[in-house]
Amino acid sequence: VSAVDRGEVEAGVVPIENSTEGAVGATQEALITSQVTICGEIYLPIRHALLSKTKSGPIRVLYSHPQALAQCRHWLAMHLGETKLVEVASTAEGARRASVEKGAAALASPWAAQIYRLQVRQRDVQDRPGNCTRFYLLGHEGARATGKDKTSLLFTLPHRAGALHKALGVLAAKGLNLLKVESRPAPGKPWEYVFFVDVRGHVDRVDFRRALLQLEKQTQDLRILGSYPEER
């Protein structure tokens, strides 16, 4: 997220939600403090593999992203209960480390084995079949309306009774379908929360813009994170 925000890259792909573990908090927090635009979403089935430089031998340390470790926790407890688990920024970074450290392994996509010249010691080590992750496509320009779109919003609320009910009621009154609502602690503000809301529709629609004008009166720090084609 930060690389796109700083202009170091033109676009980025980040995980936002997993069907097993829920929201990816690190991505949500990065979105709060950045000015990037969500311009798309994709859903990908997640299949984790155990990778190392050799097909056999003891594994001293295992590297992977926190979400991947969580998605395989039961398998890891059963098969690698004594192995040190180390969280890294991405599954790719875990694979890279496993490729240069003796006695190290990684949880990553089988494709990473080809990139980093690793051996696949075990496939499909995720605890639940059908595990799927939703990713955001990030950039600086919004996507055009397609007729089947989704808009992601971010806002905080005033400290008064029924504030969330009133805010969401604005969307309902305008006939907008609420797809998701989730809260996250506000960075640097103990016991205050940021709300992430997904609504069906595109910000270019007249009725949607009218709803946002009303929503702005009921919320604080309202931001449109992006409108983009709905994949599901």
Language-model segments: residues:
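Domain-level signature for soluble enzymes in the chorismate/prephenate branch of the shikimate pathway
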Residues: 1-232
